[in-house]
Amino acid sequence: NIQLKGGELGYDLSDADEAARITNLIKEREAQGYSYEAADASFELLVRESLGLAEQFFEVLHWRVWTGDEQGLDGDSEAIVKIKIDGEVVKLVGEGFGPLNALDQALTGALKAKYPAAATFDLVDYRVRILDQGHGTDAIVRVLIDMTDGVRTWTCVGVGTNVIEASWEALYDCYHWGLSDAGSRVASLAG
């Protein structure tokens, strides 16, 4: 029940039209392969967006990943993330043991000056599931990422035919939810 789940997260979804709109959106996304049962943070972000409560901490302008032996990487990966925060463009390179680790390093580096909480975020689990068996390397995949800041742990989902793009989607949501949660905790301590 969407109304019950929304209530558990602190959102009043008693308006039948609003609840129906969110339910339809979730059904559309589930038909594409998304699953929110194990991705509460992505569910909450979807509800916030539907209610017009989504916070825009940063805008992604561009990202790119290299992996393998090219450019002297010796099997490691390198990522460039270019984002806009409060009108300022920030571009950072991250290196890591795989494409997602490199993207995580680059995004953390780009965010931490404006949002110090981002430096506390740690990716603790990463799961990939093939959704349409038999399609081989062009299969649709679902990615779940668990992230923690040492206080809370949250999970986000990404879906697509490109495992790196699906991973980026889940990572992006993890940072958005984490920054929102960190801001809420700071506000409640100040209040």
Predicted regions and their residues:
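Terminal or standalone catalytic/regulatory effector modules within metabolic enzymes
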Residues: 1-191
